């Protein structure tokens, strides 16, 4: 799940930065470049990307209105964020649950492919 989310948002960020819309807000530009440095670099390991996933979700929540998404893509991204939050809020014996990446891959793969096209 996490990897697919990362690549989906990464593609959106790349498109947005490439369009030049980020130049008006230096904080947005800086954060977007940080996200791209982590998630856009194929040499960054999966653990590092997983560790930075909360920052990516926070970035999306803060700047989602500025990202050029279709209504369908925005609804899908919001559902993914909601599911991510729900999964992280699940607790087993008072400790956050581990795993669950397979479901996320299945949910996000079509979205990642649609953005890429």
UniProtKB/Swiss-Prot annotation:
Xref: InterPro entries: Turandot
Keywords, comma-separated and alphabetical: Immunity, Innate immunity, Secreted, Signal
Subcellular localization: Secreted
Record's signal peptide: 1-22
Annotated GO biological process: cellular response to heat; cellular response to UV; innate immune response; response to bacterium; response to heat; response to UV; response to virus
Organism superkingdom: Eukaryota
GO CC entries: extracellular space
The keyword Transmembrane appears for this protein: no
Primary role: A humoral factor that may play a role in stress tolerance.
Record family assignment: Belongs to the Turandot family.
Protein name (database record): Protein Turandot F
Gene from which this protein is expressed: TotF
